[in-house]
């Protein structure tokens, strides 16, 4: 964690200028370094009373065990940082085939739908 601390500090400062402290935000977190840094920065902001945050991780059914490890890493990080974490499993490849979309477009549409569904279900 010490290696990303300067990046997290800088990100926190930027986020404070963009977001409202009384609002709740749902973060889409892939498990990559960038999205985990964002979640970490937002957890630090929440601890300071600057907004509240939840995380959504969507597993697209494309990368097998590697994707499941990413999902577990996101869940562990959220637990450590005190962020509620919601996960969804979707089948991007079959959705792409059924709707004549590229896999990338299908994954994006399914991810956005998952974010809308989670926000609505949990009144975020």
Can you say where each PLM-predicted feature lies in the sequence?
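Core alpha/beta nucleotide-donor-binding catalytic domains of modification enzymes
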Residues: 2-124
């Amino acid at each position: 964690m010490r290696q990303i601390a300067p990046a997290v500090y800088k990100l926190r400062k930027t986020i404070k200028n963009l977001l409202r402290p009384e609002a709740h935000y749902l973060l889409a977190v892939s498990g990559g370094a960038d999205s985990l840094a964002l979640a970490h920065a937002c957890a630090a902001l929440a601890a300071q009373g600057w907004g509240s945050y939840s995380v959504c991780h969507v597993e697209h059914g494309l990368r097998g065990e590697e994707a499941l490890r990413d999902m577990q890493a996101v869940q562990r990080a959220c637990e450590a940082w005190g962020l509620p974490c919601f996960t969804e499993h979707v089948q991007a490849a079959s959705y792409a085939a059924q709707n004549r979309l590229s896999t990338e477009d299908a994954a994006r549409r399914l991810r956005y739908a998952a974010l809308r569904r989670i926000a609505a279900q949990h009144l975020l």
